[in-house]
Each structure stands twice: as C-alpha cells, then as structure tokens.
Swiss-Prot record:
GO function terms (MF aspect): mechanosensitive monoatomic ion channel activity
Subunit structure: Homopentamer.
Name of the featured protein: Large-conductance mechanosensitive channel
NCBIfam families for this protein: mscL, PRK00567.1-4
Gene responsible for this protein: mscL
Its membrane topology: Multi-pass membrane protein
A single Gene Ontology CC term: plasma membrane
Length: 136
C-alpha cells in the first residue's frame, strides 16, 4: 500500500476527523475564554482592588537599557492565564459530566432479553412433552 493510500485511510477514519474538529473548536473556545477573562472579568476585579490592571502587574528584575527591553516577571498575565485555565477546565468538566450522565441513562435502559436459540426452543418443547406424558 502506498504512503498516500495509507494516509487517506488514516485521515478518513472518524476518530481523526472528530479529533481535528475538537481541536479547532477548542482553540476557538480558548480565545473566547481569554477575551472573557481579560475584557470582562479582570477589569471589575481590578476596580474592586483599587484600579489595578492585572496585565500590567510585574516585578522588574532589570530595567531597560538602551535598545534592550526590561527583564520582568509578569505575574499579572500569569494570574489571567490561571483564571483562563480554571474557566476552561470547569467548562470541560461540565461538558464531560453531561456526556457521562447521558451515557449512564442509555446504559440504564433495560435491554430486552435475547430471544431463545433454536436449541433452547427444542429443549423447552421436549420438557413440555415430558410433563404432558407424566400428567397422563
């Protein structure tokens, strides 16, 4: 089998396509959450904490010298990233929880008993005939 045919077989499997769609949607969702945190959540928190802009919070390790930028630890951006992660993790948790509850409901649905096999039907007929002979 040629390399191209193998790749087509691999790429056309449902799991690979589902994974690709999930990655694209996940990336878009991450951007939405980042904007939500940076533009909606953090400004009111900054006002409550005395007009702090979290994205500007940093510790300067070395001041800028000439063309070289300052060396800083940008812990404000880190705080925003942690909040982003927390919201995304919670959303994923809630989605998985919903999916798992749907799976449980499907599993809990009572299954119809399997139809008896021909051997079982034949044995039942023999049993019924033997009972009928004993009653005579």
């Amino acid at each position: 089998m040629s390399l191209i045919k193998e790749f087509k077989a691999f790429a056309s499997r449902g799991n690979v396509i589902d994974m690709a769609v999930g990655i694209i949607i996940g990336a878009a969702f991450g951007k939405i959450v980042s904007s939500f945190v940076a533009d909606i959540i953090m400004p009111p928190i900054g006002i409550i904490l005395g007009g702090v802009n979290f994205s500007d919070l940093s510790i300067v390790l070395q001041a800028a010298q000439g063309d070289a930028p300052a060396v800083v630890i940008a812990y404000g951006k880190f705080i925003q990233t942690v909040i982003d992660f927390t919201i995304i993790a919670f959303a994923i948790f809630m989605g998985l929880k919903a999916i798992n509850s749907l799976k449980r409901k499907q599993e809990e649905a009572p299954k119809a008993p399997p139809a008896p096999t021909k051997d079982q039907e034949l044995l039942s007929e023999i049993r019924d005939l033997l009972k009928a002979q004993q009653e005579k």
